[in-house]
């Protein structure tokens, strides 16, 4: 045997008809070339409010690493997702490290 177990390789270069998605609505057909008209992916960046930053900074001053319970509480009070809170703490630690390193190199 050749190790392929009867599987056939099919490259994308071979001519294949484009896949079509049919809507339950009459006369509506979605084609892959329409994909660019509907932007997907990253959301636009929205700056945090002063109230949100104040709460995040207050908690960061207490502890640089956040517990699950504190993350959930901050998420609820600031109207941010738990993921946003986690990433803010990660970014804040990096920012502090940069500032400290910059102070070390200038002195």
From Swiss-Prot:
Molecular functions (GO terms): DNA binding; DNA-binding transcription factor activity, RNA polymerase II-specific
Cited PROSITE patterns: HOMEOBOX_1, HOMEOBOX_2
Primary location recorded for the protein, binned into one broad class: nucleus
Compartments where found: Nucleus
DNA-binding region per UniProt: 41-100
Keywords, sorted A to Z: Developmental protein, DNA-binding, Homeobox, Nucleus, Transcription, Transcription regulation
Record has Transcription as a keyword: yes
Superkingdom of origin organism: Eukaryota
Any Pfam family: Homeodomain
InterPro entries: AP_axis_regulatory_Homeobox, HD, HD_metazoa, Homeobox_CS, Homeodomain-like_sf
A single GO cellular-component term on record: nucleus
Task performed by this protein: Sequence-specific transcription factor which is part of a developmental regulatory system that provides cells with specific positional identities on the anterior-posterior axis.
Family (UniProt): Belongs to the Abd-B homeobox family.
Protein name, per record: Homeobox protein Hox-A13
Species this protein is from: Ambystoma mexicanum
Lineage: Eukaryota, Metazoa, Chordata, Craniata, Vertebrata
């Amino acid at each position: 045997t050749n190790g392929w177990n009867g599987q056939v390789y099919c490259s994308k270069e071979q001519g294949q008809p484009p896949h079509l998605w049919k809507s339950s609505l009459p006369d509506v057909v979605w084609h892959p070339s329409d994909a660019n008209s509907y932007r997907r992916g990253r959301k636009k960046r929205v700056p945090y409010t002063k109230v949100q930053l104040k709460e995040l900074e207050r908690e960061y001053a207490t502890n640089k690493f956040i517990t699950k319970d504190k993350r959930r509480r901050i998420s609820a009070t600031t109207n941010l997702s738990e993921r946003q809170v986690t990433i803010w703490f990660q970014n804040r630690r990096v920012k502090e490290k940069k500032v400290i390193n910059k102070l070390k190199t200038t002195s």
